[in-house]
A protein has these predicted regions:
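Acidic, Mg2+-coordinating catalytic modules of nucleic-acid enzymes
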Residues: 95-227
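Switch/communication elements of ASCE P-loop NTPase nucleotide-binding domains
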Residues: 1-105
C-alpha cells in the first residue's frame, strides 16, 4: 500500500510539471497488483494511466481489474507464452489480439488467448457478433447463420433442445445449436432446462465453434470481395 500511495502522489505531482522539466523515465512493474485489494488495483491503474501520459510504462499483469479496463484497448498489448522449443523459452506475440473486434481486445478475448480461459463475457461477445452479422440480429437469425455455416464448412452438429414457455404460456421445445442454448442459459439463468453445469461444461467448445464460424464468414466475405 505504501508503494501505491507513492505512485499516486508521484503521478499527481509530475502531471503538473511542464514538458521541459520532466526527465525521460521508464517505469517497469512486474505484477504490481499483488496483495492489493481490487479497489487498490483500480487506484493503481489510474495512477499508471496518468503517468503513461508523460512517461513510458511497461507492466506485466494477471489482474482482471487491469484487463477489464477500457484503457487497455488502446494500450500496446503483448502476450508472453512459454515455449520450450525456443532458446529463450518465451514467445512474445501481439497480432492475435487484433484479430476479432474493431474496438480492440476485450477482457474476455485477452483471457481466452493469454490464459486459455473461456468466459461468458467472451461467449456473449462472439454471439453478439454473429447476431450483428445475421439478417435480423435475433437469436433465431444467429442460430440460422450458425447452422448455415456448419453446412458450408461440412461440419456435423447435434442440435440441443431449449424448452421454454411462449407468449401464450404454452411449453415450447426449440431445436437450437449449442452456442444458442448456452447464450440462452446465460441470459435466462432461471430456466434450468439444460441442467446444472451446462454452461460450464460446454463453454469452451461453443467458443471454439463460434471462432471457426467467424473465421469462415470472414474468409467467405474476402473471397466475394476478390471476385
Amino acid at each position: 500500500m505504501t508503494a501505491l500511495a507513492l505512485l499516486v502522489a508521484w503521478a499527481s505531482v509530475h502531471s503538473n510539471k511542464t514538458v521541459g522539466t520532466r526527465k525521460p523515465y521508464i517505469f517497469l512493474l512486474d505484477e504490481p497488483e499483488i496483495c492489493l485489494h481490487p479497489r487498490g488495483q483500480a487506484r493503481l491503474l489510474d495512477a499508471l494511466l496518468t503517468i503513461s501520459k508523460f512517461y513510458q510504462v511497461i507492466v506485466t499483469t494477471h489482474s482482471p481489474i487491469f484487463l477489464h479496463s477500457p484503457a487497455v484497448r488502446t494500450a500496446n498489448l503483448l502476450l508472453c507464452q512459454r515455449d520450450n522449443s525456443t532458446a529463450s523459452n518465451v514467445v512474445v506475440s501481439q497480432a492475435r489480439f487484433r484479430s476479432l473486434f474493431l474496438h480492440g481486445p476485450t477482457w474476455g478475448e485477452i483471457c481466452w488467448h493469454a490464459y486459455n480461459m473461456p468466459t461468458v463475457e467472451f461467449h456473449d461477445e462472439l454471439y453478439s457478433y454473429l447476431q450483428d452479422r445475421s439478417s435480423s440480429a435475433t437469436v433465431e437469425a444467429a442460430d440460422k447463420l450458425l447452422r448455415l455455416s456448419f453446412d458450408e464448412m461440412n461440419e456435423h452438429h447435434t442440435p440441443c433442445i431449449w424448452s421454454r414457455k411462449d407468449n401464450k404460456g404454452k411449453n415450447r421445445r426449440d431445436k437450437l445449436t449449442l452456442s444458442s442454448c448456452i447464450r440462452n442459459s446465460i441470459h435466462h439463468p432461471d430456466n434450468k432446462c439444460m441442467g446444472e453445469g451446462f454452461v460450464e461444461k460446454n463453454l469452451e467448445e461453443s467458443i471454439n465453434i463460434m471462432l471457426r464460424v467467424i473465421k469462415h464468414l470472414r474468409a467467405k466475405e474476402e473471397a466475394q470481395l476478390a471476385e
